A protein has these predicted regions:
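Sec-dependent signal peptide recognition
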Residues: 2-7
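C-terminal motif of bacterial Sec signal peptides marking the signal peptidase cleavage site
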Residues: 13-14
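Serine-dependent protease modules
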Residues: 17-284, 288-291, 296-300, 326, ...
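Short hydrophobic alpha-helical segments used for membrane anchoring or interfacial signaling
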Residues: 92-93, 346-349
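Conserved PDZ fold ligand-binding element
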Residues: 96-103, 303-326
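A structural signal for beta-strand boundary/capping segments at domain termini and interdomain linkers
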Residues: 121, 352-354
Length: 371
C-alpha cells in the first residue's frame, strides 16, 4: 500500500468550522537525435533556473533519554541534548533574497543555513510559515541572486513537460524531467492540527523523479518559469516510485506576498461544507454532466450565508473559475483575502444564478490578521 511522504532528508549530527470537505521569448524544447531516438533537450531551461534553487540545512536540539550500561544493567541516566539536522530545498523568488520552501523543512528549526548553487553559505531568517499550505518564507542577505521568474500554474496543462530541481539525498543542484500527470490533487497529506486553518491541497502531480531532500524545490516549465513548489511523493518506502506533488505557484505567490507583508496569510473563506458530485447526484438534480460542488452546509452569518447561498446549492464557479472538486474550490477561494468581493455562480432549482460574496477570514471578520 502506497503512503504519502514529505520529501525531507533528516540526519542525526550530535469561520473556523466552515470550508471543509465532506509575452517573452520562449526557451524552446528541442529534440536531439541519438541513434534514431529523439530526446527533449532541457539544458537551456536548466541553465536558466538552477541558480535559483538553494540547499537548506536546519538544526534543532532535542532532549533524548540517556542510558548507560552498569554491570549488565541498563540504567536511565536522565536526558541529554542532541543536535539534529534536516535538509531540503528552497526557491529564490526575488532579488531581495526571499526564498520559498516547505513549512515541514523549517518547522521547529533553531538555525537555518542556506547554500547557494555557487557554494556560498549564508544564514537565513524565517519570515513566516503557513501550515495550511505547507509553505514557509525565508530571507537571506546576499548579492548576485538569480530568482526564478514566476509562471502561471493555472495555464499549466496535463502532459506538458516540467523539470524538478532540488537537492535529493544532499546531491545538490539535481535536475530531473517529467510531465504534469494531473492537477488539483487533494491527497490529505497536510495534517490539520488543532488551531490551524483548514489545509489547502490542490497539488500538481508529476512523474519527475523526486526523493528525500527535494522538499521546497522548484517545478519549472519549458519556459524556465516557476509553476510549483515540490512538496511530497507517493511511495511505499519513502523513495520515488513515479508520483510526486507540487504546490501551484499561483497559490504559493499569494502566501509569500502575505507573509512578507503581514507575517500571516490573509486567507478568505466562504463558510461552507461541500460534497463532491457523483453521476447519480447529478442525475437526481437533472444535470446532464457531473460538475460543481454541492453545498452540504452553509455556516450561519458567514460569507456565503450573507450572500444568499443555501444548503443544497450547487457551486459552479468562483471568481469565474470552474470548481469541480473540493481542491479546486479551496485553491481558488484561498487565493483571495478577507474583504475581497468574489463573484460566484451556482445552480438552484433548475436555474443558474450569480451573486457576489464578501469573503471573511477564519474568525468570521474581514480584519487583517497579523502575527
Amino acid at each position: 500500500m502506497k503512503k504519502l511522504v514529505f520529501v525531507l532528508t533528516m540526519a542525526l549530527i550530535g469561520c473556523q468550522s466552515g470550508q471543509t470537505q465532506q509575452n517573452e521569448e520562449m526557451n524552446r524544447v528541442v529534440t536531439m537525435p541519438t541513434q534514431g531516438v529523439r530526446y527533449a533537450d532541457f539544458s537551456d531551461v536548466a541553465a536558466l533556473t538552477i541558480d535559483g534553487v538553494v540547499h537548506i540545512r536546519t538544526v534543532q536540539t532535542r532532549l533524548t533519554p540517556l542510558y548507560q550500561s552498569f554491570f549488565g544493567f541498563i540504567i536511565n541516566q536522565g536526558v541529554q541534548r542532541k543536535e539534529y539536522s534536516a535538509y531540503g530545498s528552497g526557491v529564490i523568488i526575488s532579488d531581495e533574497g526571499y526564498i520559498l520552501t516547505n513549512n515541514h523543512v523549517v518547522q521547529h528549526a533553531e538555525q537555518i543555513q542556506v547554500t547557494l548553487n555557487d557554494k556560498r553559505v549564508v544564514p537565513a531568517q524565517l519570515i513566516g510559515t503557513d501550515p495550511a499550505t505547507d509553505l514557509a518564507l525565508l530571507k537571506i542577505e546576499a548579492d548576485g541572486l538569480k530568482p526564478i521568474p514566476m509562471g502561471n500554474s493555472d495555464s499549466a496543462r496535463v502532459g506538458q513537460p516540467v523539470l524538478a530541481i532540488g537537492n535529493p539525498f544532499n546531491l545538490t543542484s539535481t535536475v530531473t524531467a517529467g510531465i504534469i500527470s494531473a492537477k488539483a490533487r487533494n491527497m490529505g497529506i497536510i495534517e490539520n492540527t488543532r488551531g490551524m486553518e483548514s489545509p489547502i491541497e490542490s497539488f500538481i502531480q508529476t512523474d519527475a523523479a523526486v526523493n528525500p531532500g527535494n522538499s521546497g524545490g522548484a517545478l519549472v516549465d519549458a519556459n524556465a518559469r516557476l509553476i510549483g513548489i515540490v512538496t511530497a511523493i507517493a511511495s511505499a518506502d519513502g523513495y520515488y516510485t513515479g508520483y510526486s506533488f507540487a504546490i501551484p505557484v499561483n497559490l504559493a505567490q499569494k502566501v509569500a506576498d502575505d507573509l512578507r507583508r503581514y507575517g500571516h496569510v490573509q486567507r478568505g473563506y466562504l463558510g461552507v461544507n461541500v460534497v463532491e458530485m457523483s453521476s447519480s447526484m447529478a442525475a437526481q438534480m437533472g444535470l446532464k454532466e457531473v460538475k460543481g460542488v454541492l453545498l452540504a452546509r452553509v455556516v450561519p452569518d458567514c460569507a456565503a450565508d450573507r450572500a444568499g447561498l443555501k444548503q443544497g446549492d450547487l457551486l459552479l464557479k468562483v471568481a469565474g473559475v470552474e470548481v469541480n472538486s473540493f481542491a479546486e474550490m479551496m485553491e481558488e477561494v484561498g487565493r483571495h483575502a478577507p474583504g475581497d468581493l468574489v463573484d460566484v455562480t451556482y445552480y438552484r432549482n433548475g436555474k443558474t444564478h450569480s451573486t457576489t460574496v464578501t469573503l471573511q477570514n477564519s474568525q468570521g471578520t474581514t480584519a487583517v490578521i497579523r502575527r
